[in-house]
C-alpha cells in the first residue's frame, strides 16, 4: 500500500492498533486483502489496505470493517468502490483524520457517520466498542437479531442481500452456460456425471483460491492432478466424465471466470441447490431448499447456552448440503473460547455434528461446506449416506444428540414405497419424521425445524 505521507501512515497504524484492542487480531485483521468486486461487470479483484473480520474463514459474511486510504479517490466513491468486501463499516484514513462511514449497497445508502481527529482515535474506539467489536457487528449483520432504530442508522441491512444477488446471478449464468456448452459438445452426456465433474472442479478452484496446498500451485493446465487431489481430499472416486473435450471445456470456464476469494460457504449451497440438482432428482427425493437466512434464524433461537459445552450434540436428518450443520458450527464457534487450539476445535465440531442424507452427491457438497466453515480442516465429518426412515443407525444417533435441526421432505410416502418401510405411523413424511424424533430425543432435547403447516 502507498501512503501520501508519514502522517497518514501513522494515523493508519493507530487505526489498526485500536482495531486490535477491539479484538481484531492475528488472522482477524488482514492487510492488503484481496476480494472480488461482484458489483462490476468484469468482476475485478480489488485490494484493500486492511480488513477486519469477526471470524475465519474470511468472507463477505464475516467482514466487519474496511480500512481505506484517501489517495486520489476519496469520500463516498472510494467507500462504494469497496462495498463488495461485505463490511458494513469503513474507516477512511486521510492525512488529517479518520472518517467513519456506513457502507451501503449503493451511493445513496452509503453515508458519513463521524470524523475522528488523530488524538481522539483511542478514546473514540473505546466509546464505540459496543458497536464496532466483532461479535456486535456480526450480530447486526444477521437476520434474526433485532436492531433498534439507532442501530439501523449505522447498518445498511440491504448491503449483503444486494451482494448475494449479484454473486448468485453471475454464478448461475456462468455455470448454466458451462452445462449448455458441455451438453452441446457431448450429445450423450449423463447430466449427473457432468454435475459431479463441475462440482469437483469448483472444489479444486475453491481450494486453489484459498491457497490450500497443493492446490495453490495448480493452474488450469493441471486438470488431471486437480481431479486426483480433490478425490483424495474427500476420499471419493473421480467423476465418470474423463473425455478431454468436456473436461477441458468445464475447466476453462470455471478456472478463468470464477474467483472464490471472500465468498461465503452459502455460495456453494446456492450452486448445489439451484444449478446442480435437476428437478427430477428434487422431486424423487421430495427435497426443497432451505434459505441460509432461515437456517441461521432457527439456530440463533436455539438456547445452546443451557447445555454444557460437551452436551451440544446436534443431528441434521435430511441434511442435504448441510445448511443447518454449517449454521450450527458457526454458532458453536461463537460459544467456544476464542483461544482454543484449531485442531481441538475441529475435533470438537466433529464430535458435536451429525448428518444423515440419502443423496451421496449432497454429502459431498456438505463436506466441502463444512470444510470451508471450519477452514481448512476437512477430515472426520460424520455424514451418514442412509435413508432416515430405514437407517439402522438413525435412532441411536438421535438418542445421543440433544439438538435436532432439519428441513424434512414435505412429500407423502407413495403407495409403491410404503411396503419398504416398517412400522409407519403416518404416510406423511414430516409427521412420520417428527414421531420418530420425539420418541427418542433425550429429555430436555431441543428441536429446530422447518415444517409445512399441515404436516
Task: Indicate where each model-derived feature is located.
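Short secondary-structure junctions and interdomain/linker hinges
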Residues: 174, 178-189, 205, 209, ...
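Short, solvent-exposed loop/edge-beta patches enriched in aromatic
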Residues: 57-61, 83-86, 209, 306, ...
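Short, solvent-exposed secondary-structure capping/transition elements
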Residues: 188-192, 207-218, 284, 307-311
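Intrinsically disordered, charged low-complexity linkers and terminal tails
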Residues: 1-2, 298
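Short, basic/polar, glycine-containing "phosphate-handling" surface segments that engage DNA
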Residues: 2-204, 249-269
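SAM-dependent methyltransferase catalytic region
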Residues: 273-455
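Coupling/switch/interface segments within P-loop NTPase motor domains and analogous charged loops
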Residues: 200, 204-214, 219-220, 225, ...
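Long recognition/docking surfaces used for binding and targeting
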Residues: 211-278
